[in-house]
From Swiss-Prot:
The EC number(s) this enzyme carries: 2.1.1.257
Gene designation per UniProt: trmY
Coiled-coil ranges per UniProt: none
Cysteine pairs bridged by disulfides in the record: none
Official protein name in the record: tRNA (pseudouridine(54)-N(1))-methyltransferase
Subcellular location: Cytoplasm
Length: 198
């Protein structure tokens, strides 16, 4: 199983965003839609060997974590952002009533919402995965032999904060796909294709 953890610094934590203006009213929730599509979609189906955690830190009640579990996923992911945004909207609606910090509630089969922080998610994932931080100054991906259950941490268009990077020191190995900053959706697609070829 490969895992991707995306920290979304501005993505809203309320379902009150317009499907007609995902970047503006959703705090760039459009990035999450593209990320999910790149993480899971194949030409004729979805990947069952992928798990995604997205931690949202936008207004009004951060954090919220939306978790997609490939082997259990029954919801239909389509290439368009709008239908994926509807899934996120439903998860955030159910997440409004959550009070416990780490309890997950199933929204659809394979889709969960919680109040987990970025740190909570990393700690949970590292119990059964080897962590890698995807960043421009990391070791080239071509030089790394990945274990059975790799987990990749990356940021949105704003990246990770210095505090997040300090938290990852010593627990996540830095790796890069190139020396430039790429879109998160492109990074996850590249990593999936790279691992497919191993």
């Amino acid at each position: 199983m490969r895992t991707f953890i995306l920290k979304a610094n501005t993505a809203v934590t309320s379902p009150d965003f317009s499907l007609k203006d995902l970047p503006g009213t959703g705090g760039r929730i459009d990035l999450l839609c593209r990320f999910l599509n790149s993480a899971f979609l194949l030409s004729h189906g979805i990947r069952k060997d992928v798990r995604v955690f997205m931690t949202l830190y936008g207004r009004p009640n951060p954090p919220k974590t939306i978790h997609f579990e490939g082997p259990k996923l029954k919801v239909r992911l389509n290439p368009d952002e709008r239908s994926t945004a509807l899934i996120l909207k439903k998860a955030l609606k159910i997440g409004e009533d959550l009070r416990e910090p780490t309890k997950e509630v199933e929204v659809f089969p394979g889709v969960y919402v919680s109040n987990m922080t970025f740190e909570d998610v990393v700690r949970r994932v590292m119990k059964d995965s080897t962590l890698y931080y995807l960043v421009e100054d990391g070791k080239p991906i071509t030089e790394i032999e990945f274990p059975q259950n790799p987990a990749f941490v990356l940021g949105d268009h704003l990246g990770l904060s210095k505090e997040d990077e300090r938290f990852l020191e010593g627990i996540a190995k830095k790796v890069r796909i190139g020396r430039r900053s790429y879109l998160a959706s492109h990074v996850v697609a590249f990593v999936n294709i790279w691992l497919d070829g191993m």
